[in-house]
Amino acid sequence: MSRAAVFSRQCFWRPIFIALLCLFAAACQTTRPVTSADAERVDLRLQLATAYLERGQPNVALTEAKRALEVDPSSARAFNIKALALMALQRVDAAKQAMQAAVALAPTDLSYQHNVAWLQCMSGDVEQALQAFDAVILRAVNDFNPAQTHLSLGVCAIQAKRFELAERALRQAVVDARYANAANFGLATLMVQSENWPAAVRYLASMSPAYRVSPEVLNLQMHIDAQYDRMQQAPADGMNPSAFN
């Protein structure tokens, strides 16, 4: 398996890595008056959309977000969820349009700025995304936790092969329990990139048992195990199998 295959751009779209995305904003912004009943309908639709997105069902999430927008066409949160669903479906242009709508409706909400940066990263504008993540971290205030942005910055930096930046960012994210599993996976991936197999094993072992059985983690573990096997078979090449123990 090639190193590029170890860390694909889509791997974090799986439900266990939804931590990379800001699903909820600090508030539910809207620019037009809505009745209490309508607000409840929108909230219910978006709760459903979020749940479907977390379960890896972006098509259904997109439908629910669209239904929310039928009730309130100026809901920034609905445009945000719509954009994330479109991102998961790899409909990049449509996702950008929806995210731009969310930002236009709530320009001061750092959650949406975070997601704009992630969309840039996933669509190939990696350097621009890194700058955008930095801007979000610099602007972080009391109601916005920068640990999530450090996590996404680290993942994006891996895409740019900015490994030192990636490691610094992921180490800042790993201290937050909510993002520790995804950050440890990112750090393990970094260690595989640098062929530091013992460290990669340690980071994978730091993940919770439920996360360690995900397809992405098992795939990375298999890659590491293959290195164990090669070292056992060819110690004369300078490899030391005991380094993994």
Q: Predicted regions span which residues?
A:
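Terminal, low-structured helical/coil segments at or just beyond the last alpha-helical repeat
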Residues: 33, 39, 197, 201-245
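Structural marker of alpha-solenoid helical repeat scaffolds
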Residues: 37, 71, 105, 139-142, ...
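TPR alpha-solenoid repeat register
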Residues: 44, 78, 112, 146-149, ...
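Canonical tetratricopeptide repeat
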Residues: 47, 81, 115, 152, ...
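Register position in tetratricopeptide repeats
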Residues: 54-55, 88-89, 122-123, 155-159, ...
